[in-house]
Amino acid sequence: MKLLLVEDDEYVAQVLAEAFGSDGHETTIRYTGEDGLAYLTRERPDAVVLDVRLPRLNGVAVLRQIRATDPALPVIIMTGLATPGEIAEARRLGVAEIIEKPQVLRHFSEALARIASRDRLQDAT
C-alpha cells in the first residue's frame, strides 16, 4: 500500500516508515499537519497514518480537513495522549482505526488488512 505518515517526531517517523517498508508499504513522511494536507492536494495514498498530537494543527483537525475533501480515504489515528473528546471526534469523523502508539507496530498490519477488506466489500457493491 501507498501510505502517508504524518508524525512530528522524526525518530518515531523513521522507525515506523522502516517497519512499514519491511511489510512492503511505500511510505511518505510529513512532519506537520499542514505538510500532510499539502501532500494530499497532489497525491492520494491508499491510507493515511496520522498522529493526534501534532504542533499547530492537531491530528483531529487534519482529519476534519481530510474528510471535507475525501470522505472515503482511510485514516488510521495513532495516539498515546489523546483525550476522550479527541477520540470521540475522530470516530465521529469516520476514522478507520485508532491504535495506541506503543502498539502501532504490533497492530498496524491487522489494521491495514481490515481497511483493505472494507475496500474490497465496497468495490463489490
Language model regions located:
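Two-component/phosphorelay signaling modules centered on CheY-like receiver
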Residues: 9-28
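Acidic catalytic/metal-coordinating carboxylates
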Residues: 32, 58-61
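Short amphipathic alpha-helix used as the core "switch/output" element in two-component signaling
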Residues: 38, 60-71
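Active-site beta3 strand of CheY-like receiver
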Residues: 43-49, 54
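The feature encodes the CheY-like receiver
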Residues: 55, 83
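C-terminal output helix
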Residues: 85, 103-113
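Short, glycine/charged-rich "phosphate-handling" switch motifs in NTP-dependent
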Residues: 96
